[in-house]
Design a protein with these regions (language model features):
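Solvent-exposed, amphipathic alpha-helical segments
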Residues: 21-28, 69-80, 152-163
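Basic, helix-initiating cap at the start of DNA-binding domains
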Residues: 1-28, 32-40, 57-60
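Hydrophobic/aromatic-rich alpha-helical bundle segments in the mid-to-C-terminal region
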Residues: 106-110, 114-117, 121, 136-180, ...
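Alpha-helical DNA-contacting segments of helix-turn-helix folds
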Residues: 52, 59-66
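Hydrophobic alpha-helical connector segments
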Residues: 61, 72-100, 112-115
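Amphipathic alpha-helical interaction segments
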Residues: 17, 36, 86-90, 94, ...
Length: 190
């Protein structure tokens, strides 16, 4: 027996559809209106307003959703397996695949929101562990702080997301990872 009543399932499905549609609409047109988002989702504006009372509440939900997606990607990147550099490449590949979801947030200034930054930092804690592991094994330079490496990674990812239209996903992964790896590879890198 399903514990969620059909109305609840519909509401969750509509919310997910609205978030996905908002990310896509705002990625292609940062000035997209709530009406544009509703149309893209194939829903009426009243449905959108039942979930999000304003553009800001929709953007806040998009920020939360983006961090949740990043959490899922990092968790699914098998961060404890293989070499630290290979684990970092998997993280980069996963985050780059979310580019369209993050682009509107960068353009809207989400990176200035302290709550978003705190949640993003939590999402990247496994990356801190990867870097530390790499430093201990000699794969990653020990003379560069973990904080610097993780901050540089996030900046490179943000640059790739901003250039989304100019780069293929594969090229973005190679540029982000290649640039990072050139600066952090230790003497015992594979």
């Amino acid at each position: 027996m399903n514990a969620d009543p059909p109305a609840r399932v519909d509401a969750e499905r509509n919310r997910r559809l609205l978030l996905d549609s908002a990310a896509a609409a705002l990625a292609s047109d940062p000035d997209a209106t709530l009406g544009d988002v509703a149309r893209r989702a194939g829903l009426v504006r009243a449905t959108l307003y039942r979930h999000f009372s304003s553009r800001e509440s929709l953007l806040e939900a998009l920020r939360d959703d983006a961090v949740e997606c990043a959490n899922d990607v990092v968790a699914g990147s098998r961060v404890a397996e293989d070499s630290a550099l290979e684990a970092l490449r998997r993280v980069v590949t996963g985050i780059v695949s979310l580019g369209a979801r993050f682009r509107p947030l960068l353009l809207e200034g989400a990176t200035q929101d302290p709550e978003f930054l705190r949640k993003r930092e939590q999402a990247f804690m496994p990356v801190v562990m990867i870097v530390r592991r790499g430093q201990q094994s000699g794969e990653i330079r020990g003379d560069v702080s973990v904080r610097w490496i993780v901050t540089a990674l996030m900046a490179l990812l943000a640059a790739a997301v901003r250039m989304d239209a100019d780069l293929s996903e594969e090229d973005a992964v190679e540029l982000v990872f290649g640039t990072l790896a050139l600066g952090i590879q230790g003497t015992h890198s594979p």
